[in-house]
């Protein structure tokens, strides 16, 4: 499904919240959307690795890395695994790496920036907890839609207007 966030904002102004414009689009899909799975972690992508190994079922992984610009929470191997396992997209409040390869993956990816250094793997983080960044609280089970215009969230699934 191709999503256009301005059209969704126009059709559902009472439902959507718009994330502050700070993200760049790095993935092979320029638009994506789905039900959210959330992770809160800091410079440790152990939970990201665990989740992309699971069936994505068209969902979106939202990773709150605390906005850290010191380590990459997603690289090409995890992005390719997420695409293979049916994830619609990944939003990282932090950095990613291997951006040239990720741009070819059948996956939506938005992040703050790229950084070549990988994270430590200490098994630290929280899964499916509400996370807040960009002026919005992302709640597990709610919905996220993203394209080159921005990222929006909604408590319920949205359909593109006719």
Swiss-Prot record:
Q: Which domain of life is it from?
A: Bacteria
Under the heading Pfam families, the entry gives: RraA-like
Q: Catalytic activity annotated for this protein? A: 4-hydroxy-4-methyl-2-oxoglutarate = 2 pyruvate; oxaloacetate + H(+) = pyruvate + CO2
Name the keywords, alphabetized.
Lyase, Metal-binding
Quote the cofactor binding remark. Answer: Divalent metal cation.
List, alphabetically, the Gene3D superfamilies matched.
Ribonuclease E inhibitor RraA/RraA-like
List ligand-binding residues for substrate: 75-78, 97
- Which terms does the record give in the GO molecular function aspect? 4-hydroxy-4-methyl-2-oxoglutarate aldolase activity; metal ion binding; oxaloacetate decarboxylase activity; ribonuclease inhibitor activity
- Name the cofactor(s): a divalent metal cation
Keyword presence, Oxidoreductase: no
Single GO biological process annotation from the record = regulation of RNA metabolic process
- E.C. numbers: 4.1.3.17, 4.1.1.112
Similarity field: Belongs to the class II aldolase/RraA-like family.
This chain's function reads: Catalyzes the aldol cleavage of 4-hydroxy-4-methyl-2-oxoglutarate (HMG) into 2 molecules of pyruvate. Also contains a secondary oxaloacetate (OAA) decarboxylase activity due to the common pyruvate enolate transition state formed following C-C bond cleavage in the retro-aldol and decarboxylation reactions.
Question: What protein name applies here?
Answer: Putative 4-hydroxy-4-methyl-2-oxoglutarate aldolase
Q: Which organism is it from?
A: Ectopseudomonas mendocina (strain ymp) (Pseudomonas mendocina)
């Amino acid at each position: 499904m191709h999503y256009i966030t301005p059209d969704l904002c126009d059709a559902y102004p009472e439902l959507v919240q718009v994330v502050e414009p700070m993200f760049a689009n790095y993935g092979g899909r320029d638009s994506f959307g789905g039900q959210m799975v959330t992770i809160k972690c800091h410079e440790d992508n152990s939970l990201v690795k665990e989740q992309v190994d699971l069936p994505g079922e068209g969902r979106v992984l939202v990773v709150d890395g605390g906005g850290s610009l010191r380590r990459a929470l997603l690289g090409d191997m995890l992005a390719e695994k997420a695409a293979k396992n049916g994830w619609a997209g990944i939003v990282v409040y932090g950095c990613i790496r291997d951006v040239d390869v990720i741009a070819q993956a059948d996956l939506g990816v938005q992040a703050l920036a790229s950084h070549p250094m990988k994270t430590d793997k200490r098994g630290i983080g929280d899964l499916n907890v509400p996370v807040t960044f960009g002026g919005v609280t992302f709640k597990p089970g709610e919905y996220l839609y993203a394209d080159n215009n921005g990222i929006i969230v909604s408590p319920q699934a949205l359909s593109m207007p006719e």
